[in-house]
């Protein structure tokens, strides 16, 4: 009996690992959910601080809509923040996103195969770097 339970757990673990690995493939995805994992803020005097993204008021999750050319906080965050994207480009397995709003220039670079995210925001006297991961957002359920 113990052997069956162990085998069952291994099968479940293998299935969940393969699903997680497939979930990060962004090829063809137009709606992407990204999470910030680590952030660094630097000021013009050379001081830099590394901390959790939320310590710098960086949203934990961002929804990226490539068709609508916008990046937004999730509804669950209650923040209702959204920024337009001026540039949306896919090239050589990488998604490049750029925007400009409220005196800030921002860029996101997302690897389509791994879902890994590198982002930067710059404004006068301050820059922010963020590392994270992205996954395709599920399609909405069809209504009957």
Describe the residue ranges of each PLM region.
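Bacterial N-terminal signal peptides that target proteins for export
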Residues: 1-9
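N-terminal signal peptide c-region/cleavage motif recognized by signal peptidases
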Residues: 15-19
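Short, surface-exposed coil-to-beta transition loops
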Residues: 57-58, 82-83, 101-107, 127-131
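Contiguous, well-ordered beta-strand patches that form the walls/edges
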Residues: 66-104
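Short, solvent-exposed loop/hinge segments that bridge or flank secondary-structure elements
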Residues: 28-29, 33-68
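Boundary of Sec targeting at the N-terminus
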Residues: 22-24
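Short, exposed beta-strand-loop hairpins at the edges of beta-sheets
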Residues: 109, 118-129
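Short, low-complexity, Pro/Ser/Thr/Gly-rich segments in the mature regions of secreted, periplasmic
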Residues: 132-143
């Amino acid at each position: 009996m113990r052997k069956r339970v162990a085998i069952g757990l291994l099968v479940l673990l293998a299935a969940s690992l393969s699903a997680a690995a497939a979930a990060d493939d962004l090829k063809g995805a137009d709606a992407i959910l990204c999470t910030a994992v680590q952030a660094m803020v630097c000021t013009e005097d050379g001081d830099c601080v590394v901390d959790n993204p939320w310590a710098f008021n960086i949203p934990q999750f961002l929804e990226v809509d490539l068709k609508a050319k916008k990046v937004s906080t999730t509804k669950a965050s209650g923040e209702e923040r959204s920024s337009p994207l001026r540039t949306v480009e896919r090239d050589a397995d990488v998604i490049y996103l750029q925007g400009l709003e409220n005196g800030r220039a921002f860029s996101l670079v997302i690897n389509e195969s791994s879902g890994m995210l590198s982002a930067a925001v710059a404004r006068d006297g301050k820059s922010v770097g963020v590392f994270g991961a992205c996954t395709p957002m599920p399609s909405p359920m069809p209504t009957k």
